[in-house]
């Protein structure tokens, strides 16, 4: 390959990045082919990220593998945050442009300093070269006019060393103009070499160009997913740094005499230019799978090998360069530059040795881990082989034999290819054309390794699925046993409930019959007593009504006669009142006329008096005084007559009001008389009836007293029986509540078991679908892998023994990892169940195929269906029992209601007795009231007569 060529520049590794990219591309292509074959293209990104996060370690571990490699490539641990920031800056183009502008300003300043020093050195070297080599093919003049064509040539050369084209991959790499100017400045600062050295460097450059062209044709796809994106960006930035060093190394290989300032500037500027490499994803429909730690370990080991060999080649080249420089050195300045460069190379060699030692330590640790994992894998393989021997399934054995055969063939191929690779590497210093073959071999090795890894993954996934199915079958059988035991217990409970039900029904029927007979007898007795009492009451009421009617008619006649007499007297009184009113009016008119005449006379006398006063002298004044006295007396008499009139009017008004009140009183008295007469008649009738009833009731009372004594005795007996029935009913209620509670609990348990069974059925269905999918995928994978195996059979050279190669170690490590994970998951899943099944041994369970699983699942489904039917029947039985319990409780409530009616009947008897006593009391009270009413009537008559006499006297 090209990086093993003898003339490699000390500034960087020109073809190491191409080799790493080629290696990654081959791994990605193999993974893509396997994913296309297995049909994993349609999987979502979320599933891939979840699988990556659960199965593989974070990106920090992959970074630690590449730290020593990055250290001797010019990046230390302090530069890692810059690379991380560069990876983040790909999402923010505005920030990237700002950083690029800052980097460009720094580079322009450094270029100006470099160009000043380069002009001085070129003038000195030109004279030395012209003196030694008169024939010069190329002349470099550091003029501003000649910078443009040289920069164009360098840009064309730098485009050949670009990582990849946008057409061939999903990423874009662009060199910034500042970086291009840096390259032109570094090349312009170097002196020209003789024609012989230029001709020697041309074939090497052509070879390197061919390698880079081949690298262009390869497809770069994103390897890392999810959490590993940052590490991938770190690797890409490291690769871009190596590319920049390669470009600088190629420019420096033309002239070995480079000033330390220029090298220092290039080293400073190289990491600054790396953020200009922008990777833009074209959004390809396919996303590659996650790289394993084993592939990264293999890459690190190979990089360590490459670095060790390149250090040897560098030492050889440095010795050649020193010999050439010692022979061609003519000036003291050149020798000083060579010494400085040798010191720098020694420092770089020391750094590389330290990095190699760290990488070797890590590789040794990884090798130890791989050896341990291989040992565990061998143990697990021995266990699996023992289990395979005990299994009876031919399909599983055939698949495993095919897998082992494929793994053996792949290991043989890997061994053969590694041998071929070693031979090709030895011959590479002589033949540059063998680089393409080695790359193809590396790709084939990577493909074989990926096939082995995927086969181990598939086997681990199948074993995990088989274990899951076994655990599900165990769970189903355990649940089946639990359901059977619960069904038996429920059947026993139902039988006991039925027995209790029959016993309670018998007791309830007996008690019901007894109470019904007692109630019928008591109802008949009390109904007869009530009918007799009602008949006696009706007869007494009829008698009293008849007597009261006759008395009322007589008294009404008497009251009518009295009313007619009173009406006549009132008419006479009204006539007298009208006559007296007329007389009073006439008298008033007479008095008014007299008063008017007197007033006229008074006025005339006043006039006369005034005239006489005016005419009569003082001698006649006593007469005037007499006249005035007469006038006063007349005035007083008039006032007295007015007062008499007023008193008479007031007496008239009072008499009228008294007459109205008397009429009202008369009416009220008449009403009261009628009411009292009616009441007297009613009471007299009632008295007669009650007297007749009294004799009958006295007789019936004696009979009822005898019956009451008998009823009391019966009541006490019935009360005792009712108390016993109430106690029994309370016991039955408690038992019914307990039965209901038990039924509720059993129902809840049955519902929970039904839910669990449904969940298990869903799980079994899902696992069944997964098995069918895996079977289809395996069949498709087997059908696609057969032609691949036939094509790869041409590479087999006999049956070589197995060795602990990198591919086998990686495959075994992944297989042991998946086996351990599946074993842990199965153990945890089995520990969750409390009753493990001892009949199904793991050796027998591993021999079961998906068809057998389907058969067992169908059996389990049938059993579950039968259990569901039995549960439905049990639920129907439970419902019928609940209905019967409800009926029995209703009957008990009816009996209780009838028992509660007994004290009501007794209360009715007591009420009848009280009514009888009250009737007797009423009889005595009514007699007293009649006597009082008669006395009141006599008093009213006397009062009425007195009032009438008073009115007559007043009127008179």
Swiss-Prot record:
Keywords: Coiled coil, Cytoplasm, Golgi apparatus, Phosphoprotein. Residues 77-89, 118-129, 206-219 have a biased composition (Basic and acidic residues). Residues 160-177, 184-193 have a biased composition (Polar residues). Pfam families: TMF_DNA_bd (PF12329), TMF_TATA_bd (PF12325). Its main location: Golgi. It is found in: Golgi apparatus; Cytoplasm. Residues 333-765, 851-951 form a coiled coil. Residues 70-230, 278-298 are annotated as: Disordered. The modification Phosphoserine is found at residue 793. GO terms for cellular component: Golgi apparatus. The keyword Manganese does not apply. The C-terminal domain (817-956) is necessary and sufficient for Golgi and cytoplasm targeting. Interacts with RABH1B and RABH1C, but not with RABD1 or RABD2A. Golgi matrix protein playing a role in tethering of vesicles to Golgi membranes and in maintaining the overall structure of the Golgi apparatus. This is Golgin candidate 5. The gene is GC5.
């Amino acid at each position: 390959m090209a990086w093993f060529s003898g003339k490699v520049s000390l500034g960087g590794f020109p073809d190491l990045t191409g080799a790493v990219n080629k290696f990654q591309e081959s791994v990605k292509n193999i993974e893509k082919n396997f994913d296309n074959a297995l049909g994993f293209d349609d999987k979502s990104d979320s599933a891939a990220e979840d699988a990556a996060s659960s199965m593989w370690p974070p990106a920090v571990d992959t970074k630690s593998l590449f730290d020593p490699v990055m250290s001797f490539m010019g990046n230390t641990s302090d530069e890692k945050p810059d690379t991380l920031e560069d990876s983040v800056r790909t999402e923010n183009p505005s920030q990237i442009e700002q950083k690029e502008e800052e980097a460009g300003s720094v580079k322009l300043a450094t270029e100006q300093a470099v160009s000043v020093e380069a002009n001085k050195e070129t003038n000195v070297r030109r004279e030395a070269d012209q003196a030694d080599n008169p024939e010069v093919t190329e002349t470099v003049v550091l003029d501003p006019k000649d910078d443009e064509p040289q920069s164009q040539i360098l840009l064309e050369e730098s485009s050949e060393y670009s990582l990849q084209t946008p057409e061939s991959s999903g990423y874009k790499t662009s060199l910034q103009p500042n970086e291009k100017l840096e390259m032109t400045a570094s090349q312009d600062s170097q002196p020209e070499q003789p024609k012989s050295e230029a001709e020697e460097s041309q074939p090497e450059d052509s070879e390197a160009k061919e390698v880079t062209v081949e690298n262009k044709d390869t497809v770069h796809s994103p390897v890392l997913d999810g959490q590993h994106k940052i590490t991938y960006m770190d690797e890409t930035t490291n690769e871009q740094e190596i590319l920049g060093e390669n470009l600088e190394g190629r420019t420096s290989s033309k002239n070995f005499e480079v000033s330390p300032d220029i090298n220092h500037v290039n080293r400073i500027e190289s990491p600054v230019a790396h953020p200009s490499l922008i990777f833009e994803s074209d959004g390809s429909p396919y996303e590659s799978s996650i790289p394993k730690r084993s592939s990264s370990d293999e890459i690190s080991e190979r990089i360590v090998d490459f670095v060790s060999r390149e250090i040897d080649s560098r030492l050889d080249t440095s010795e050649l360069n020193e010999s050439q420089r010692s022979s061609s050195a003519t000036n003291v300045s050149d020798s000083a530059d060579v010494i400085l460069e040798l010191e720098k190379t020694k420092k770089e060699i020391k750094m590389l040795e330290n990095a190699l030692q760290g990488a070797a330590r890590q590789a040794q640790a990884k090798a130890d881990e791989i050896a341990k994992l291989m040992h565990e894998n061998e143990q697990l393989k021995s266990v699996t082989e023992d289990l395979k021997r005990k299994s009876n399934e031919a399909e599983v054995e055939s698949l495993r034999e095919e897998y082992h055969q494929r793994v053996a063939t792949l290991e043989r191929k890997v061994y053969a290819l590694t041998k071929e690779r070693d031979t090709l590497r030895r011959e590479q210093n002589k033949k540059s054309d063998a680089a393409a073959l080695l790359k193809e071999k590396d790709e084939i090795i990577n493909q074989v390794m990926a096939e082995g890894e995927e086969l181990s993954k598939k086997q681990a996934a199948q074993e995990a699925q088989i274990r899951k199915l076994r655990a599900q079958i165990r769970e189903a059988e355990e649940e089946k046993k639990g359901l059977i035991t619960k069904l038996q217990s429920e059947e026993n409970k139902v039988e006991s409930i039925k027995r209790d039900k029959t016993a309670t029904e018998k007791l309830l029927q007996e008690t019901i019959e007894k109470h019904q007979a007692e109630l019928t007898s008591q109802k008949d007795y009390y109904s007869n007593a009530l009918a007799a009492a009602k008949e006696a009451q009706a007869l007494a009421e009829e008698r009293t009504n008849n007597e009261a009617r006759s008395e009322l008619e007589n008294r009404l006649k008497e009251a009518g006669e009295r009313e007619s007499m009173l009406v006549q007297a009132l008419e006479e009184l009204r006539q007298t009142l009208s006559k007296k009113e007329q007389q009073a009016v006439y008298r008033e008119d007479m008095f008014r006329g007299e008063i008017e005449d007197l007033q006229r006379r008074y006025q005339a006398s006043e006039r006369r008096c005034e005239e006489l006063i005016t005419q009569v002298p003082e001698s006649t004044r006593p007469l005037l005084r007499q006249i005035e006295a007469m006038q006063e007396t007349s005035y007083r008499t008039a006032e007295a007559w007015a007062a008499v009139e007023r008193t008479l009017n007031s007496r008239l008004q009072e008499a009228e009001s008294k007459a109205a009140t008397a009429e009202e009183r008369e009416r009220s008295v008449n009403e009261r008389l009628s009411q009292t007469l009616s009441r007297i008649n009613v009471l007299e009738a009632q008295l007669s009836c009650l007297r007749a009833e009294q004799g009958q009731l006295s007789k019936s009372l004696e009979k009822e007293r005898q019956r009451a004594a008998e009823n009391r005795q019966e009541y006490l007996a019935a009360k005792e029986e009712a108390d016993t029935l109430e106690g029994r009913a309370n016991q039955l209620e408690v038992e019914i509540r307990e039965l209901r509670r038990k039924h509720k609990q059993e129902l809840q348990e049955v519902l929970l078991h039904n839910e669990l069974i449904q969940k298990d059925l869903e799980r079994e269905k899902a696992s069944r679908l997964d098995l069918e999918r895996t079977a289809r995928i395996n069949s498709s994978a087997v059908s696609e892998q057969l032609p691949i195996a036939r094509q790869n059979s041409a590479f087999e050279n006999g049956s070589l023994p197995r060795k602990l190669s990198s591919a086998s170690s990686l495959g075994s490590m992944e297989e042991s990892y998946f086996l351990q994970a599946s074993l842990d998951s199965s153990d945890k899943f089995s520990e969750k169940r409390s009753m493990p099944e001892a009949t199904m041994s793991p050796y027998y369970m591993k021999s079961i195929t998906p068809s057998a699983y389907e058969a067992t699942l169908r059996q389990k489904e049938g059993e579950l269906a039968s259990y569901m039917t039995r549960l439905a029947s049990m639920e129907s039985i439970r419902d019928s029992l609940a209905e019967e319990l409800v009926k029995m409780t209703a009957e008990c409530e009816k009996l209780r209601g009838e028992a509660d009616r007994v004290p009501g009947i007794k209360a009715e008897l007591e009420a009848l007795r009280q009514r009888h006593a009250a009737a007797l009391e009423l009889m005595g009270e009514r007699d007293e009231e009649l006597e009082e009413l008669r006395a009141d009537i006599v008093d009213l008559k006397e009062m009425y007569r007195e009032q009438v006499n008073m009115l007559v006297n007043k009127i008179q």
